[in-house]
């Protein structure tokens, strides 16, 4: 067995009455842990290699804590706490970044992104949806939907209320980790698996999906869809949209460069370069016909928006008299043609 791992984490989670995992909380996930740490815990777990999620007892957690005491004080302290748990425990070991095979593995990878250890698109998330059970997220934690009605009745009989906040595959990120230096006005609008960079403010209408996020700093008042990453200093106006990779059958990865502004109720279906502005209310899809204007507001040519993908210093607007979508630049006609040909 190799003493190297891609990732390792000790977790505490929730199971249904059949013993199936509903969710797992990893307080301190590790990316590429030290070989000596792996060598110390492998014999105690009976781990021989591969990607595995191994359920452990509190006694085993105490043994692991002792083994790690001279090697990693933080993980030793965590395991000491886990040894007192009244909830199911699991150790998840990923030898490689391969397709997912279990719910604890899926939760570990979502944690790695939200802990800012890996950026969106940096992990293999193949097979994640079948491995994330659709559960009721309540004031008493995750509840299997098949057990929800009985749990609600039990609560009422005790004079309590089991409040259901959402029914979804993904929990909100802040129930698992709150990254340093961020503001999130409505925590339900940021899913676990979001990467929220330092200096990011997510206002009430903002939303960040899993495997998506922001470099920060920036203001998010619109939707950062799955797969989308927003560069530093960029702002998304109220109600604006970024087209994700999960809907519409598109395979273009949408990104927003640095210093961009997407206006309120606007949207993009192409990746933006740096210092781009999209006028409020204007939705640009890849096939949108755009009149390209030079530095003197003269028409250079009509192109599809996809031909401008990734270009910097562009202003997208709609002509209020003709309705034509225009792209204004600070470049001459010659420079624009050269840029377009270079892109092709």
PLM features: what roles do these ranges have?
Residues 1-175, 306-344:
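Terminal amphipathic alpha-helical/low-complexity segments used for targeting or macromolecular assembly
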Residues 106-109, 180, 252, 274:
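General structural feature for long, well-ordered alpha-helical segments within catalytic domains
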Residues 152-204, 208-209, 213-215:
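Glycine-rich adenosyl-nucleotide cofactor-binding module
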Residues 225, 230-232, 236-344:
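Glycine-rich hexapeptide-repeat left-handed beta-helix
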């Amino acid at each position: 067995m190799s003493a190297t791992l891609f990732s390792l984490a000790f977790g505490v989670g929730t199971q249904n009455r059949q013993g199936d995992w509903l969710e797992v909380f990893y307080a301190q996930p590790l990316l590429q842990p030290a070989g000596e740490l792996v060598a110390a815990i492998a014999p105690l777990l009976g781990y021989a290699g591969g990607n595995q999620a191994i359920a452990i007892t509190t006694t085993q957690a105490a043994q692991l804590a002792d083994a790690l005491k001279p090697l990693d004080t933080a993980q030793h302290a965590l395991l000491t706490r886990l040894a007192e748990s009244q909830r199911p425990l699991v150790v998840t070991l990923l030898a490689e970044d391969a397709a997912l095979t279990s719910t604890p593995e899926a939760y570990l990878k979502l944690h790695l992104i939200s802990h800012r250890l890996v950026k969106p698109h940096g992990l293999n998330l193949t097979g994640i949806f079948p491995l994330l059970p659709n559960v009721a997220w309540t004031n008493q934690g995750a509840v299997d939907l098949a057990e929800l009605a009985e749990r609600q009745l039990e609560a009422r009989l005790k004079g309590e209320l089991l409040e259901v906040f959402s029914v979804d595959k993904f929990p909100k990120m802040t129930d698992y980790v709150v990254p340093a230096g961020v503001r999130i006005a409505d925590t339900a609008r940021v899913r676990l698996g979001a990467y929220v960079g330092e200096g990011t403010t997510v206002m009430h209408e903002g939303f960040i999906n899993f495997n998506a996020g922001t470099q920060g700093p920036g203001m998010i008042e619109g939707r950062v869809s799955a797969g989308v990453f927003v560069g530093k200093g960029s702002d998304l106006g109220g109600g604006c949209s970024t087209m994700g990779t999960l809907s519409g059958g598109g395979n273009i990865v949408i990104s927003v460069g640095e210093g961009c502004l997407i206006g309120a109720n606007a949207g993009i279906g192409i990746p933006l370069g740096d210092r781009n502005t999209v006028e409020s209310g204007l939705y640009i899809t890849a096939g949108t016909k755009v009149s390209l204007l030079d530095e003197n507001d003269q028409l250079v040519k009509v192109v599809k928006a996809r031909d401008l993908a990734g270009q910097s210093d562009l202003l997208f607007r709609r002509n209020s008299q003709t309705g034509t979508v225009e792209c204004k630049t600070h470049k001459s006609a010659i420079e624009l043609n050269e840029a377009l040909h270079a892109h092709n």
